[in-house]
Amino acid sequence: ALANVQLNLQSAFRNCFEKSRKRQNGFPKFKSAKHSRKAYTTNNQKGTVAIIGNAIKLPKIGKVKAVIHRRPDADWIIKSATVSQDGDGKYYVSVLFEFARNITPVPISDNAVGLDYASDGLYVDDKGNTGTNHKYYRESHKKLAKEQRRLSRMKGSKKGETKSGNYIKQLRKVNKIHRHISNQRLDNLHKISAEIANQYDVVCVESLDMKAMSNKGFGNGKATMDNGYGLFLNML
C-alpha cells in the first residue's frame, strides 16, 4: 500500500513537470486526513489478496464478509485490490485481475450514426430518434432538500464547529440520497451507451464544453448536470 502511494506521488510530480502535455497539471496539493479520499490500493503478494467464498482476504485485516459482484474464473490472477469508503459509510473493494483471452475480430461495416446533445432527453440522432433519460436529480430533489435542511440545523454544520454524532448520521443520509441518484444515472447511461456501441460501428458526436454549458449564465446548469451527457460520451 505504501509503495502505491509513493508511485502515485511520483506520477503527480511527473505530470506536473512534463512539458509535452497539451494541458499541464498543477503542482501536487497536500491533502489533509479530514478531507482526503478514503481509499488505498494494496498489491497481491503470494496470496495476501484472495476471494474465499463470500469473503475477501486483505493484508493485515484477514477475511472480511463481502457481497461478491462477479465471480472470477479459476485461471484469473489477482494483481491488486483497492479499498474505498463512500460518503454514506459503506466500504467497497475493487479487485484487478489478469487473464488471457482470445479476441474474435468483429466484421467491419458502414453502419454509422450521428448524435447531438438534447437537454430534454439525452441525445438526438441523425434519424430524429431521441434517447430516453430520466431527470433523476429532480425526481429526488424534494427528499434531498428536506434532509439537507435537517443537516444545516445540526451542530457541526457551521465552519469551525465540532461535528456531532447526529450531524455525521444525517450527513450519511444525505450522501446516501446522492449515491442513489448517481447509481440511477450510471445504470441508465451504461445501458444506453452499450446498446449504441453494439448496434453501430461508427458514432459521430459534436465536441461540446459541458462545463461551460452548465454555467449559471445559461440558466440551465442543473438540467445539464442532471443529463449526464459528458459521462455518456466517455462511456461510448
What are these regions (language model features)?
Residues A74, G87-L236:
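Positively charged, helix-rich recognition surfaces that bind polyanionic ligands
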Residues A1-G87, K222, D226:
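Acidic carboxylate diad motif detector
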